[in-house]
Amino acid sequence: KSAYMRF
């Protein structure tokens, strides 16, 4: 759900 390290 986070935009951080979203692959």
Curated annotation (Swiss-Prot):
List each coiled-coil range. none
Give GO BP annotations, semicolon-separated: neuropeptide signaling pathway
Question: What is the annotated localization of this protein?
Answer: Secreted
UniProt keyword Secreted, yes or no = yes
Q: Identify residues that carry Phenylalanine amide.
A: 7
Q: Per its UniProt entry, which superkingdom is the organism in?
A: Eukaryota
This entry carries the following GO cellular component terms, namely: extracellular region
Keywords, A to Z? Amidation, Neuropeptide, Secreted
Q: Which residues form the signal peptide?
A: none
Please state which protein family the record places this protein in: Belongs to the FARP (FMRFamide related peptide) family.
General function of this protein: Myoactive; induces a rapid concentration-dependent muscle tension increase.
The protein's name: FMRFamide-like neuropeptide PF3
Q: What is the lineage of its organism?
A: Eukaryota, Metazoa, Ecdysozoa, Nematoda, Chromadorea
